[in-house]
Amino acid sequence: IIGMKEKSRVSQYDVVYHSPGKSDRSAMPLGNGELAVSVWMDEKGVLRFYLARTDAVTELDRTVKLGMVEVRTAPGFLSDGDFIQRLELEHGIVHMKSCGKELWIWVDDASDIVYVSGRMKQEMKVKVRYYTWRTEKNLPWNSPVRSTGLTEAADMVDELEDRICFRHINGENGIEHLARLQCVDDLSCVPDLLSGRIFGGIMYLEGGRRVGHELVKGECTDFCLKVATHSAQLEEKEWLDRVDGMLKGSRTADESREATAVSWEAFWKKSYIFVEGDKERKPVCNERILDCVSEPMECTGTASPVTRGYLLTKYMLACCKDGNFPVFYNGMLFNLCPGNREHLGVMEFVSGFTRIPCGEYPTLSINPDERSWSNEHLWQNLRLPYYTMLATG
């Protein structure tokens, strides 16, 4: 059983930033097993995060993001020389502080809802916006069904009085085409997990209202943003009712944060490994990849690079390994935008880790939906998470 000493040792490996990021390469991971979030604070003081689910799968069988959320405060969140961002491993929370302003971001342990809670010493205005780059029907550049004429439908966004609803509704898919290519004539034996699938969510800012394309809360010293997500093969109205019900039945921010922290503490109690005697060990990693890491990052009290790697990998796996669909791809649900505005499949391998920002916003052609080794569950696309899961029992 893990005791207080071991719990404090987990916290020693919290990841800490002392300045905001230059791009989504600065993102920290969060998740509850199904819903995963990549969150970062940019140099303008804007909080951004991607949403991802294991079962957010398009009609072309691509595992994609649900979109991106942006949170702004006025006055801005950042103050010169006073910023700290911590990934609290023990509690599964990202905590940011800057001169009397604090943000907490987490994924609820019992429902697929992202919470962003803020507290400020002085009154501020809060603005929240949802972005999707799938704004028109599209055929991804490396799609294996290019010859069929199939495309992915555009996402739908409804801007309501006090919330924003976003979703992707799968259109015609390529299951029959791909089955024929494999000489499978009896389609009844081929599971269809794509037809009629809807994935997305509803974004709600407590005490706020919609102004233009944003949810806005006037002068306030605290706020709570909830983003409820869902994916299922349902009729559209039933899907909307289900997500709306998730919001109505959701916990308060304090209840959710406390329960989620307890859940993560229980996770770390199940098993643990702490290695000693390797403090001087150099990371086994391509130097050109290490050169791309320019964040002023620290792991407080890190005594063991091996332990750090083990704990951080175990944490990331826990964020997305218990979903409706299996863990997919080496990057799991935390893939980011390609660097240099180059498609991943045609660039030199190491340049995929570039720190050069892809631009402020993803586009229809360059976005974090992209994966360099296509979408199949091939061994080379799965070896990193599954080897690790085997090693951790």
For the regions a language model picked out, list residue spans one by one:
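Zinc-dependent metallopeptidase catalytic helix centered on the HExxH motif
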Residues: I366-S374, L378-W379, R383-L390
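Carboxylate/His-rich catalytic cores and anion/metal-binding grooves
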Residues: Y310, L317-A318, L382-G393
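Acidic/polar, glycine-enriched structural segments that form the non-catalytic walls/loops
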Residues: I2-R25, L30-N375
